[in-house]
Amino acid sequence: LADEQKAFLKRFYYDRLNGSTNPIWLSAIEDLNTLEDNRIYLVVKKKHVDGDHKVKYAVIKVPDRVFGRFIKVPSSDGFDNIMYLDDVVRFCLPLIFIGTKPSTYEAYSFKFTKDAEMEMDNDADYGAMEKIAQGVNSRKRGEPIRVIYDKEMPREMQKRVFERLNVRE
């Protein structure tokens, strides 16, 4: 990224993204099933750069439903560049974690789908649309059945995400 693009992304963070990218420390949550399914998340590895080199993990929901999947980033050559919103969030990780010790960051995307068991029997008390609505509502409480994750995600991070989702690999 050119310097003016970096400045644009920082302004974008402070003006728009700030407040919608709240990290959840993995140490503070046992079960990621409470998160909304079919959303894009980043799992972040934050490693202190000072003497202790302490490592912490967090999850950040990418606010794509608010800002869209792509962000137009202007450039000095007159062309607009397009960035994935999750890449913008990755770039802004030092701003998101600004009140913490200086660190290096690794972030990888994942999303999961919860089970929505829908039994379509011939119950005359409910119409098909009511049954589908009940199935969609039960999905909020369902167990994750599928996880999609960045192919570059290190194995140890995959294990952390899968364990917190109670999903076998």
Residue ranges, per PLM feature:
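N-terminal non-catalytic structural scaffold regions of very large proteins
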Residues: 1-169
